[in-house]
Amino acid sequence: MDWTGARARTSWGKRPQTAALGLAATFRHLNTDDHRPIEQTTQTPYSLHRPLPPPSGEPATDTPTHSSCPAPPIAVPSSLLLPRTTHPSSRSSHICACHTPVTARHSPNRLCPVSLPTPTPRSMAQGTKAPAAAMPPNSSVLNMPALNAVNRKKQKRREKEAAKKAAQDPSPPATLRNGVSSGSTHLPANAAHTRQPAPHYDDPELDDPQYDDEDDADFYSDEEAEHYEHAYGTNGHYQQGYAHAPIPSSSKKPRKKKKGAAAHPPHAYTQHVAPRHSPAPNHSMVTSGSKSIWNTSTVEERERIREFWLSLGEDERKSLVKIEKEAVLRKMKEQQKHSCSCSVCGRKRTAIEEELEVLYDAYYEELEQYAHLQQDVGRFLPDANFGHVRSAPHPRPLMTTHPPPGPYDDEEEDEYSGEDDEEDIFKYLPPPDAADFLRFGSSLTVKGGILTVADDLLKNDGKKFIEMMEQLAERRMQREEEANFHAHPSMHRYNSAHNHAPQPEEEEYDDEVDEEEGFEDEDYEEDDEDEDEAMTEEQRMEEGRRMFQIFAARMFEQRVLQAYREKVAAERQKRLLEELEEENEKKDQKEAKKAKEAQKRKEKKEKQRQIKAEEKAKKDAELAAKEAELKAAEEKRLEEQRKKREEQRKKKEAERKAQEEEKQRKEAERQKRLQEERDRQQELERKAREQKALEKKVKDDAKRKERDRAGSQGEGGSGRRRPTTTASARSVKVCRSPHGILSSFVPKAPTPSRPRQTSRQGSHGSSPKTPQVAPGTSKSMSPTSQAQGNMMPKSILTKPANSQHAGHHPLGQPSSPMPPIGPPPGLSGPPGLSMGLPPGLNGFPGPGSMLPNMMSPRPGMPFFPQPPVPQAFRGFPPPGMAGPRGFPMDGPPGLGPMPGFAGPNQAPPFGMGPPTQHSRQGSGSFASMDVPISAPSVQPIHRPAPIQRPSSVKPHDSNKHGQDSDVDELADHLGSKALLDEEDVPEIPDRRSSVQQHGSMRSMPIGFGFPDAPNSHQSTAFNGFGSANTASIWGTPPSQAFSSAAGPWGNSPTSGFFTNPLTMSSPRVSDHRAPNEPRLVWLRRVICTVCKMLSSRHAGPDGFIDANEVQQQLDAFRDPREPVVTQEELKEACDIIDGTHNNGGGSLEYKNLGDGRLSHIKFVDTTGPPPALGEIGSPIPSHSLPVAGFGGRFPGLGPQGF
């Protein structure tokens, strides 16, 4: 029964070439340019041939022929070669004598599969390769009924010649890709060299019309071609030798939209055929490849897939097949869910399920046999049944008839990488029409030299497979219908029980058949006798099973590949975890190594630190030992110094006690002497009072007598009055004699060796100069002139009314007008500045400044000094009566006397002047004229002249000098002079002219009142009341002998005595020994000063100075009145440890010689560095006011002594 329709004269089982061509589509060793004879190409499962000559009735260029085929091309019914998209025009197709369907177009790209084994389970599992001569024609290729008698005859002849030639020239065994020859292949059980009877075909008018070859090459749309664009070559490149072959353009007008692009080259996979002599790779190279699971080549991947399949157990293999079978059944049920529900379709579905189970069971048995065979032989099976030509891996995956152990290209993985299960393979499309299953034959069409049965099935989402299964299921029904048809020929073959719509392509096929009936009927009629070769039922079943295995193998490949990839993914995941673990382990090891190294470095540093600590501790211990030694030495030195200080203190205490005792003794003696002097003075005063009283009485008596006598003798002459006066004077002289001699005596003239000067009684303004007359002229003066000067009588005790003191000017001073006076008495200039007065200005000593920190006169003291006593009295107090003061003249130790008060060893201020000679003022008688006029001169002190009568009444008797010597001796010692000792009388030198040339070098350097000012001479070391003896800035000479201690204005040109003008060579006043200053203190201070001065010039490398040089400087600084400094005193002064401000400060070190003398001396300054000056506007308090007042030194403003 023919399942293609009423006009079909043959059934599915009568078309064995369809199954054979479908199986041939699994072979991948393709070559369109192979023109070898059949006997030379039998090593491959199919051979490539040149096109056959065109059949009769068509151009030679359009008829595809195979040069190696002896039989002419045979027309194939278009019902088996119908394309998917039908066209109403008639088409014609031809089949070569080798039963390969060819078309009129694309003749260079046709294949001629020969030498196909019988599709038994054993042959499919083992995939044998045998020479073409050893295989019967009916075992691989069955003769199809020809549309033309000539073609059938040629086919028969060629078939016979090919069989004979194959039997005579057997081809060598084919070489497998892995180097395994085909000698071990198994021939099918039904293989025979006998020719099978030719099948009988029905009338040719019942066949499907032929179709043009233009549609044969266009069974795949552009969308379908996209599915294969990615799997051509490794990394997207073509293999060498796989270039596009030029495709001749069609001579006919295209009838389909796909033919419009006929000029373009076909899809890439159409030309990707293996070269004829491709070398097979060595199996050892595959096994010795890298075992890396990350980067694997195609050969390695195939080897791994094969090993994976062989490593699977029986249960795992069954599970894979079972999953596949269940998936297919589920898909088929889904596809037929909305199909016809008639009894015929129901029986068909049941038959499909049963047939599917049987096919899968048989397929699993073949897989088991293949697995056992691979495990036993240890090599790959031939590629005849599995479609894998190992000598040239094809870039595009094709369907195979063997299970998935075969290798796969990388493109296969890319193609199916997104297909996780079988559902990804099937793509749902609209359900086909009733006759769409007939289009399954279009998958057998050659396209670009490649048969694509399995790909076409897969691309239609299993629809073709379901149709194929339906066809297989309908075989039983077809056999029943065929039996009924032979029994009742009038019955129509079409199953009217179906509800399916009639096939729309039948009319089109009629048109096509009518066009070619003219030349096809003749061929069928001529070869009717040769159509005795028919296919048995078993062969038809085998053909169907082969078609199923083609699809099932391709589906199962994906299952195995998916399982393999899952395994590889698991292995890679495991390997990744292992690598991560290894990486973590390496990282941990690296970190541990780093930690270990860090620990080593830390230990090394700790060790170094300990070494440094030990060294430091050792150094500290040594330093502590040195410090302890130094401390012990220092303590020893301090102890020695303490002992020395104690000894010095005891010594000083003893000296002080001795001095106090000496002072007390001297004070007692002085008090005793003073008491004696007071007693003597009181006695003398008493006697003088008595004598004065007696003299007054005598004088009064004499005056009274004279008045009486004058009254009685009023008219008497002068001659009579002279004896009376003489007598009265003589009587008075007798009374004045201190020795009690009452006898009168003749007065004598004053001692000529001691001339005296009469005192001036008038004022300076009225009588600038007192005239003096020579002694010789005194006798010629009349009493009248004397009376004019003294209008009233005077006694020796009466003070003249108009007498004025002349203490401001010493005797001998010219009576010319004096220069203008200086500042008022008691007021000094600015403190601290010895400005002095301009030339010609006279100064007065004052009590000092009234400013703070300066001494001022004590309360009760007059602001100005008291004027001196008149000239008639002595100008200085008695011994011990220095003046009305209630405090010592000297200041505190180390300081000078108070301002305005001279010290005990100083002369009175220049305002007082030196003491005048002991003389009395003349009474203005003629005796004053006895002295000739002469220049004033300073005469030494001499005895005062005795009281005599006036010269007018003095007898001119000069020969009584010897008689009155005793009286003169007593007269010279009258008064206060009698109280003075001979040693207490000062020897005052003659006064020099006080007028000095301005700018004279004899003046002292200008001083500023500071004790430490350069070249400042002062009486004490540090006088806080200003400099006492500083010169004036006006060039006036200083007064060192009779200047005031607080005379900062300098000295007047008319006061004081001159000092040494060469003051630069004179020693500093501070280096002189101060009053009441201990000698050791002064000596130490001078030694310190000398050492400081010589340290910059004569000091040795250690700072010591020769002791002899120091002693020479001491002798230069020593006052002539001071004793010479001895070595013992020098050493004793250096032993003073307590350096103070008074004794020079610091400390003195010395070196001893063997005999106890000093060899070297060194001064060590123990004071700190001078204080730093403050910022501008922020003075340091220590600089705001000197410590010692305005007379003290400035701290820290220069070297010592400034």
Curated annotation (Swiss-Prot):
Low complexity biased stretches: 830-848
GO cellular component, one term: cytoplasm
Subcellular location: Cytoplasm
Basic residues composition bias: residue spans: 252-261
Regions of compositional bias (Acidic residues) in chain numbering: 204-217, 408-423, 504-536
Compositional bias (Polar residues): 178-187, 754-789, 916-926
Keywords from the named record: Coiled coil, Cytoplasm, Stress response
InterPro entries, A to Z: Fungal_stress_NST1 (IPR051195), NST1 (IPR025279)
Biased composition (Pro residues): 816-828
Compositionally biased spans, kind Basic and acidic residues: 158-167, 579-710, 954-967
Predominant place of localization: cytoplasm
Coiled-coil segments on the chain, per record: 557-704
Region (Disordered): 28-217, 236-291, 390-423, 487-543, 579-852, 904-967, 979-1015
Function: May act as a negative regulator of salt tolerance.
Entry's family note: Belongs to the NST1 family.
Official protein name in the record: Stress response protein NST1
Organism: Phaeosphaeria nodorum (strain SN15 / ATCC MYA-4574 / FGSC 10173) (Glume blotch fungus)
